[in-house]
Protein backbone atom coordinates (compact mmCIF):
# COMPACT_ATOMS: atom_id res chain seq x y z
CA UNK A 1 0.00 0.00 0.00
CA UNK A 2 1.74 3.12 -1.19
CA UNK A 3 1.84 6.06 1.22
CA UNK A 4 0.15 8.43 -1.21
CA UNK A 5 -2.35 11.04 -0.11
CA UNK A 6 -4.86 11.08 -2.92
CA UNK A 7 -7.89 12.95 -4.11
CA UNK A 8 -10.92 10.65 -3.61
CA UNK A 9 -12.03 11.52 -7.14
CA UNK A 10 -8.81 9.92 -8.42
CA UNK A 11 -9.27 6.70 -6.46
CA UNK A 12 -9.70 3.37 -8.18
CA UNK A 13 -13.21 3.36 -6.73
CA UNK A 14 -15.90 4.07 -9.29
CA UNK A 15 -19.14 5.97 -8.76
CA UNK A 16 -21.05 3.31 -10.73
CA UNK A 17 -22.87 1.00 -8.33
CA UNK A 18 -25.94 -0.51 -10.07
CA UNK A 19 -26.95 -3.99 -8.89
CA UNK A 20 -24.27 -3.98 -6.20
CA UNK A 21 -24.33 -5.24 -2.64
CA UNK A 22 -24.18 -1.90 -0.85
CA UNK A 23 -22.94 -1.24 2.69
CA UNK A 24 -24.05 2.07 4.22
CA UNK A 25 -22.27 3.99 6.97
CA UNK A 26 -19.84 6.75 7.89
CA UNK A 27 -16.92 4.31 8.03
CA UNK A 28 -14.77 6.64 10.16
CA UNK A 29 -11.72 4.55 11.01
CA UNK A 30 -12.80 1.61 8.82
CA UNK A 31 -12.53 -0.51 11.98
CA UNK A 32 -13.17 -4.21 12.57
CA UNK A 33 -16.92 -3.65 12.78
CA UNK A 34 -16.94 -1.96 9.37
CA UNK A 35 -14.77 -4.72 7.95
CA UNK A 36 -17.20 -7.33 9.23
CA UNK A 37 -20.00 -5.62 7.30
CA UNK A 38 -17.86 -5.61 4.15
CA UNK A 39 -17.10 -9.30 4.65
CA UNK A 40 -20.82 -10.01 5.07
CA UNK A 41 -21.53 -8.11 1.86
CA UNK A 42 -18.98 -10.22 0.01
CA UNK A 43 -20.57 -13.41 1.33
CA UNK A 44 -23.99 -12.18 0.18
CA UNK A 45 -22.52 -11.45 -3.24
CA UNK A 46 -21.13 -14.98 -3.30
CA UNK A 47 -20.90 -16.52 -6.74
CA UNK A 48 -23.14 -13.88 -8.32
CA UNK A 49 -20.13 -11.61 -8.86
CA UNK A 50 -22.24 -8.64 -7.85
CA UNK A 51 -19.83 -5.83 -6.94
CA UNK A 52 -19.41 -4.46 -3.42
CA UNK A 53 -20.21 -0.78 -2.98
CA UNK A 54 -20.22 1.64 -0.07
CA UNK A 55 -22.51 4.60 0.52
CA UNK A 56 -20.92 7.11 2.86
CA UNK A 57 -21.46 10.74 3.77
CA UNK A 58 -19.32 13.87 3.59
CA UNK A 59 -18.99 16.04 5.53
CA UNK A 60 -19.48 13.78 8.51
CA UNK A 61 -22.98 14.45 9.90
CA UNK A 62 -21.47 15.47 13.25
CA UNK A 63 -19.52 18.22 11.47
CA UNK A 64 -22.60 19.39 9.56
CA UNK A 65 -24.73 19.73 12.68
CA UNK A 66 -21.91 21.30 14.71
CA UNK A 67 -19.50 23.19 12.41
CA UNK A 68 -17.39 24.30 15.40
CA UNK A 69 -16.88 20.78 16.73
CA UNK A 70 -13.31 19.96 17.70
CA UNK A 71 -11.43 17.76 15.21
CA UNK A 72 -12.62 14.18 15.65
CA UNK A 73 -11.88 12.25 12.46
CA UNK A 74 -10.07 8.94 12.62
CA UNK A 75 -9.78 8.83 8.83
CA UNK A 76 -10.36 11.93 6.69
CA UNK A 77 -12.09 11.26 3.39
CA UNK A 78 -8.99 10.64 1.27
CA UNK A 79 -7.61 8.15 3.79
CA UNK A 80 -10.96 6.40 4.21
CA UNK A 81 -11.26 6.10 0.43
CA UNK A 82 -7.79 4.59 0.14
CA UNK A 83 -8.51 1.99 2.82
CA UNK A 84 -11.84 1.00 1.25
CA UNK A 85 -10.07 0.69 -2.09
CA UNK A 86 -7.39 -1.52 -0.53
CA UNK A 87 -10.11 -3.69 1.05
CA UNK A 88 -11.56 -4.48 -2.36
CA UNK A 89 -14.58 -2.17 -2.36
CA UNK A 90 -15.33 -1.56 -6.02
CA UNK A 91 -17.79 1.33 -5.99
CA UNK A 92 -18.22 4.36 -3.77
CA UNK A 93 -21.35 6.50 -3.50
CA UNK A 94 -20.26 9.68 -1.76
CA UNK A 95 -23.38 11.49 -0.57
CA UNK A 96 -23.08 15.15 0.35
CA UNK A 97 -24.50 15.64 3.82
CA UNK A 98 -26.11 19.06 3.46
CA UNK A 99 -29.30 20.76 4.58
CA UNK A 100 -31.33 18.90 1.98
CA UNK A 101 -30.15 15.51 3.21
CA UNK A 102 -30.47 16.50 6.87
CA UNK A 103 -34.13 17.45 6.29
CA UNK A 104 -34.95 14.39 4.20
CA UNK A 105 -37.55 12.11 5.74
CA UNK A 106 -36.76 8.47 6.29
CA UNK A 107 -39.39 7.51 3.72
CA UNK A 108 -37.87 9.73 1.02
CA UNK A 109 -34.38 8.44 1.84
CA UNK A 110 -35.57 4.86 1.37
CA UNK A 111 -37.82 5.30 -1.64
CA UNK A 112 -35.82 7.84 -3.61
CA UNK A 113 -32.19 8.05 -2.55
CA UNK A 114 -31.67 4.34 -1.99
CA UNK A 115 -33.86 3.27 -4.90
CA UNK A 116 -31.97 5.64 -7.21
CA UNK A 117 -28.69 4.03 -6.11
CA UNK A 118 -30.19 0.80 -7.49
CA UNK A 119 -28.43 -1.80 -5.31
CA UNK A 120 -29.58 -5.40 -5.29
CA UNK A 121 -28.93 -5.77 -1.56
CA UNK A 122 -28.21 -3.37 1.31
CA UNK A 123 -26.13 -4.25 4.36
CA UNK A 124 -26.25 -2.15 7.54
CA UNK A 125 -25.34 -2.44 11.19
CA UNK A 126 -28.04 -2.61 13.84
CA UNK A 127 -27.29 0.97 14.94
CA UNK A 128 -27.84 2.48 11.49
CA UNK A 129 -30.18 5.49 11.51
CA UNK A 130 -31.36 7.66 8.65
CA UNK A 131 -33.80 10.43 7.87
CA UNK A 132 -34.53 13.68 9.66
CA UNK A 133 -34.06 13.36 13.40
CA UNK A 134 -32.83 9.77 12.96
CA UNK A 135 -36.44 8.68 12.49
CA UNK A 136 -35.40 5.76 10.30
CA UNK A 137 -33.84 2.65 11.80
CA UNK A 138 -32.20 -0.44 10.39
CA UNK A 139 -35.27 -2.46 11.36
CA UNK A 140 -37.56 0.02 9.62
CA UNK A 141 -35.52 -0.32 6.44
CA UNK A 142 -35.74 -4.10 6.58
CA UNK A 143 -39.47 -4.01 7.37
CA UNK A 144 -40.06 -2.04 4.16
CA UNK A 145 -37.79 -4.15 1.98
CA UNK A 146 -40.75 -6.06 0.50
CA UNK A 147 -41.91 -2.77 -1.01
CA UNK A 148 -38.44 -1.83 -2.28
CA UNK A 149 -36.35 -3.22 -5.16
CA UNK A 150 -33.60 -4.53 -2.90
CA UNK A 151 -33.09 -6.89 0.02
CA UNK A 152 -31.84 -5.71 3.42
CA UNK A 153 -29.57 -7.49 5.90
CA UNK A 154 -28.91 -6.20 9.42
CA UNK A 155 -25.88 -7.26 11.43
CA UNK A 156 -25.39 -6.90 15.16
CA UNK A 157 -22.54 -4.88 16.63
CA UNK A 158 -19.46 -6.96 17.32
CA UNK A 159 -17.00 -6.80 20.19
CA UNK A 160 -13.60 -8.22 21.06
CA UNK A 161 -12.82 -10.90 23.64
CA UNK A 162 -13.07 -8.27 26.40
CA UNK A 163 -16.57 -7.23 25.25
CA UNK A 164 -15.16 -3.95 23.92
CA UNK A 165 -17.47 -2.94 21.07
CA UNK A 166 -15.94 -2.11 17.71
CA UNK A 167 -17.09 1.48 17.38
CA UNK A 168 -15.59 4.74 16.16
CA UNK A 169 -16.69 6.47 19.37
CA UNK A 170 -14.88 3.94 21.57
CA UNK A 171 -11.74 4.17 19.44
CA UNK A 172 -11.73 7.96 19.71
CA UNK A 173 -11.96 7.67 23.49
CA UNK A 174 -8.94 5.39 23.60
CA UNK A 175 -6.90 7.66 21.33
CA UNK A 176 -7.71 10.71 23.43
CA UNK A 177 -6.67 8.78 26.53
CA UNK A 178 -3.37 7.76 24.94
CA UNK A 179 -4.30 4.07 24.96
CA UNK A 180 -3.26 3.62 21.36
CA UNK A 181 -2.82 -0.14 21.67
CA UNK A 182 -6.47 -0.65 22.61
CA UNK A 183 -7.51 1.71 19.83
CA UNK A 184 -5.43 -0.24 17.33
CA UNK A 185 -6.97 -3.50 18.52
CA UNK A 186 -10.47 -2.23 17.76
CA UNK A 187 -9.36 -0.72 14.46
CA UNK A 188 -7.65 -3.87 13.22
CA UNK A 189 -4.78 -1.72 11.93
CA UNK A 190 -2.31 0.71 13.47
CA UNK A 191 -3.83 4.18 13.47
CA UNK A 192 -2.03 6.73 11.34
CA UNK A 193 -1.87 10.48 10.97
CA UNK A 194 -1.04 11.66 7.46
CA UNK A 195 -0.09 15.11 6.25
CA UNK A 196 2.40 17.32 4.46
CA UNK A 197 5.79 17.89 6.08
CA UNK A 198 6.15 21.56 6.96
CA UNK A 199 9.15 23.66 7.87
CA UNK A 200 9.54 24.05 11.62
CA UNK A 201 11.82 26.15 13.80
CA UNK A 202 14.61 23.56 13.43
CA UNK A 203 14.83 23.27 17.20
CA UNK A 204 15.21 19.50 16.97
CA UNK A 205 18.09 19.84 14.53
CA UNK A 206 19.86 22.19 16.95
CA UNK A 207 19.47 19.59 19.69
CA UNK A 208 20.80 16.80 17.46
CA UNK A 209 17.43 15.23 16.69
CA UNK A 210 16.08 16.66 13.41
CA UNK A 211 12.35 16.11 13.07
CA UNK A 212 9.83 15.98 10.25
CA UNK A 213 6.84 18.06 11.32
CA UNK A 214 3.21 18.24 10.27
CA UNK A 215 -0.07 19.59 11.60
CA UNK A 216 -2.94 17.38 12.73
CA UNK A 217 -5.54 18.83 10.37
CA UNK A 218 -8.93 17.10 10.67
CA UNK A 219 -7.59 14.29 12.82
CA UNK A 220 -8.75 13.77 16.38
CA UNK A 221 -6.13 14.98 18.84
CA UNK A 222 -4.50 12.03 20.58
CA UNK A 223 -3.27 12.40 24.14
CA UNK A 224 -0.32 14.77 23.90
CA UNK A 225 3.00 13.13 24.54
CA UNK A 226 5.76 10.98 23.09
CA UNK A 227 4.98 7.92 20.97
CA UNK A 228 6.85 5.03 19.43
CA UNK A 229 5.89 5.31 15.76
CA UNK A 230 6.68 4.11 12.27
CA UNK A 231 6.93 6.61 9.43
CA UNK A 232 6.38 6.23 5.69
CA UNK A 233 7.11 8.91 3.11
CA UNK A 234 5.06 9.41 -0.06
CA UNK A 235 6.23 7.44 -3.04
CA UNK A 236 3.81 6.34 -5.74
CA UNK A 237 0.82 4.05 -6.25
CA UNK A 238 2.97 1.04 -7.18
CA UNK A 239 5.91 0.92 -4.79
CA UNK A 240 5.00 -0.63 -1.41
CA UNK A 241 5.32 1.65 1.59
CA UNK A 242 8.67 1.53 3.34
CA UNK A 243 8.26 2.07 7.06
CA UNK A 244 11.00 3.59 9.19
CA UNK A 245 11.22 3.29 12.98
CA UNK A 246 10.86 6.62 14.74
CA UNK A 247 9.86 8.47 17.87
CA UNK A 248 7.39 11.35 17.75
CA UNK A 249 6.16 14.10 20.00
CA UNK A 250 2.54 15.04 19.47
CA UNK A 251 1.41 18.22 21.16
CA UNK A 252 2.43 21.79 21.90
CA UNK A 253 5.99 21.28 23.23
CA UNK A 254 5.87 22.80 26.75
CA UNK A 255 9.47 24.06 26.56
CA UNK A 256 8.91 25.80 23.21
CA UNK A 257 5.15 26.31 23.03
CA UNK A 258 3.42 26.45 19.65
CA UNK A 259 -0.04 27.80 18.91
CA UNK A 260 -1.05 24.67 17.06
CA UNK A 261 -0.40 21.05 18.04
CA UNK A 262 2.20 19.39 15.85
CA UNK A 263 3.43 15.91 15.05
CA UNK A 264 7.24 16.00 15.24
CA UNK A 265 8.84 12.73 14.16
CA UNK A 266 12.51 11.90 14.62
CA UNK A 267 13.19 9.09 12.15
CA UNK A 268 16.03 6.80 13.21
CA UNK A 269 18.99 6.51 10.83
CA UNK A 270 17.40 8.81 8.23
CA UNK A 271 18.69 12.07 6.76
CA UNK A 272 16.71 13.02 3.61
CA UNK A 273 15.04 16.42 3.18
CA UNK A 274 11.29 15.83 3.57
CA UNK A 275 9.81 19.34 3.27
CA UNK A 276 6.67 19.23 1.15
CA UNK A 277 6.48 15.43 1.16
CA UNK A 278 3.43 13.50 2.30
CA UNK A 279 4.19 11.62 5.51
CA UNK A 280 2.31 8.88 7.32
CA UNK A 281 2.94 8.43 11.03
CA UNK A 282 1.72 5.14 12.43
CA UNK A 283 1.20 5.25 16.20
CA UNK A 284 2.38 2.11 17.98
CA UNK A 285 2.70 2.96 21.68
CA UNK A 286 2.30 5.98 23.95
CA UNK A 287 5.54 6.29 25.89
CA UNK A 288 4.97 9.30 28.15
CA UNK A 289 3.10 12.57 28.51
CA UNK A 290 4.58 15.89 27.43
CA UNK A 291 6.77 17.46 30.11
CA UNK A 292 8.49 20.81 30.57
CA UNK A 293 12.10 20.28 31.62
CA UNK A 294 14.35 22.88 33.21
CA UNK A 295 17.25 22.89 30.73
CA UNK A 296 18.08 21.84 27.19
CA UNK A 297 20.58 19.33 28.55
CA UNK A 298 17.80 17.64 30.50
CA UNK A 299 15.69 17.67 27.33
CA UNK A 300 18.47 16.05 25.28
CA UNK A 301 18.90 13.38 27.94
CA UNK A 302 15.15 12.73 27.93
CA UNK A 303 15.00 12.52 24.12
CA UNK A 304 17.79 9.94 24.15
CA UNK A 305 15.81 7.90 26.64
CA UNK A 306 12.68 8.31 24.50
CA UNK A 307 14.60 6.98 21.50
CA UNK A 308 15.70 3.91 23.45
CA UNK A 309 12.18 3.30 24.71
CA UNK A 310 10.73 3.72 21.23
CA UNK A 311 13.19 1.29 19.66
CA UNK A 312 12.38 -1.27 22.34
CA UNK A 313 8.62 -0.84 21.88
CA UNK A 314 8.89 -1.13 18.10
CA UNK A 315 11.00 -4.29 18.33
CA UNK A 316 8.26 -5.86 20.44
CA UNK A 317 5.44 -4.75 18.14
CA UNK A 318 5.65 -5.79 14.53
Give short role names for the model-derived ranges.
Residues 1-12:
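Short acidic-hydrophobic, aromatic-tinged amphipathic segments that line or gate anion-handling sites
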Residues 3-5, 92, 152, 281:
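Generic structural signal for residues in well-ordered beta-strands
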Residues 12-76:
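N-terminal catalytic cores of NTP/NDP-binding nucleotidyl/phosphoryl-transfer enzymes
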Residues 31, 84, 122, 183, ...:
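Residue-level signal for inorganic ion chemistry
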Residues 51, 66, 70-71, 78-87, ...:
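Active-site-adjacent structural elements in enzyme catalytic cores
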Residues 51-53, 91, 121, 153, ...:
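A structural signal for isolated positions on well-ordered beta-strands in alpha/beta enzyme cores
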Residues 103-210, 272, 292-298:
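Classical nucleotidyltransferase
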Residues 200-318:
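Phosphate/ribose-recognition catalytic cores of enzymes acting on nucleotide-derived substrates
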